[in-house]
Regions:
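Ser/Thr-rich low-complexity repeats and stalk/linker segments
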Residues: 1-3, 10-113
Length: 113
């Protein structure tokens, strides 16, 4: 697959917590961020290790006054791992009419059991 840079400015989603390279343990992680979306659908979240295995996933609604306006999100996602490993937490928006990801942001973290 190819990645195409945004042609309409900066990415519309960002993750405030956790930060890049944070160490997380206990089987769940609080993910907080902000952004604006193109349609009224939940954001998707996936925690993926280096092998491409999904360790945890979920959805969260963006709390915004209206579609296209700045809002925030906060969600606790559970994950499963038996050893400490590097993983990427991705938050993204899918669109009904456009195949694939419309907006995507991620952070790399160290996950422990």
């Amino acid at each position: 697959g190819r990645i195409y840079p945004a042609i309409h400015g900066a990415e519309k989603l960002t993750i405030f917590q956790p930060r890049e390279e944070n160490v997380i343990a206990g089987g769940s992680v609080l993910i907080q961020g902000a952004g604006w979306v193109d349609q009224d659908v939940p954001l998707r979240i996936e925690i993926i290790n280096r092998a491409g295995d999904v360790l945890g996933s979920g959805q969260v609604e963006l709390d915004a006054p209206a579609v296209g306006q700045l809002g925030t999100f906060s969600v606790e996602i559970t994950y499963q791992t038996s050893q400490q490993q590097w993983a990427r937490i991705g938050v993204y928006e899918l669109h009904d009419e456009v195949p694939g990801l419309v907006h995507y942001t991620s952070v790399g973290v160290w996950l422990g059991p």
